[in-house]
From Swiss-Prot:
Residues 234-245 have a biased composition (Basic residues). GO terms for cellular component: cytosolic small ribosomal subunit. Part of the 30S ribosomal subunit. Forms a tight complex with proteins S10 and S14. PANTHER family: 30S/40S RIBOSOMAL PROTEIN S3, SMALL RIBOSOMAL SUBUNIT PROTEIN US3C. It comes from Haploplasma axanthum. InterPro entries: KH_dom (IPR004087), KH_dom-like_a/b (IPR015946), KH_dom_type_2 (IPR004044), KH_sf_prok-type (IPR009019), Ribosomal_S3_C_sf (IPR036419), Ribosomal_uS3_bac-typ (IPR005704), Ribosomal_uS3_C (IPR001351), Ribosomal_uS3_CS (IPR018280). Residues 217-257 are annotated as: Disordered. The keyword Hydrolase does not apply. One of its GO terms (molecular function) is mRNA binding. This is Small ribosomal subunit protein uS3. Belongs to the universal ribosomal protein uS3 family. Residues 39-112 form the KH type-2 domain. Keywords: Ribonucleoprotein, Ribosomal protein, RNA-binding, rRNA-binding.
Amino acid sequence: MGQKVNPIGFRVGVIRDWDSKWYADKKIVPALVKEDAVIRKFLNKKYNNAAVSHVEIERLKELKVKKRVKITLHSGKPGVVIGREAATMKETIASLEKLTKKEIVFNVVEVRKPEVVATLVAQSMAEQLENRASFRKSTKNCYAKSIKVRAKGIKTLSQRLGGREMARTEGYSEGQVPLHTLRADVEYATAEAQTTYGILGIKVWIYHGEILPGQSHEELRKERQSSASSNHGGGKRRPSRKGPRRSQEDAATEGGN
């Protein structure tokens, strides 16, 4: 049943660390959890065109947990986040301090290989589907880029293809994506494509290899982002067995869209 479990939460504490790092008295934990959610929602909404992969929040002892919050935003377009002469970033810090009533320490980290980040791949597919590209075409483009930049496996799923009234799930995979192996470094993300005929749900899994004892997930992530591109061939692309077989009429209709 590994395919029914969120791959990120399944590996937290084993090979992955938390995106929120802080300790607090149990009386204020609910307020801080809510504050984290508000901060992430604000940043994702403000920088929805800046290719934000994830947001890390820290309230460590040396930061004086009640008064200071350290936020690290990982983005594929750091220039959009910072702005000219850091004007956009200063505006963001002021808005966050007003929102949280706390001092904000704001850092921006560049994502150098967005092709192997599941969140950004899902966002890219959603944008292509919103521009009326076919699911197969957008999937093929993302697969080619991800496998070229050292991804060892990728899998995608989507629903309500072609605007049909009855939802049907169709997926493809290339390479290997082990879901049951805890030491397997698997990224997972979801995205929604707002189309003229409704919302399409997209799921993406990307496999980067195994993390062995003594290795750190964060160190390997930085190494992947800074390493040179090399071509790692994947397996044969195959359709998911979950979806029903498509007729020639369905294929022609979707190809026309």
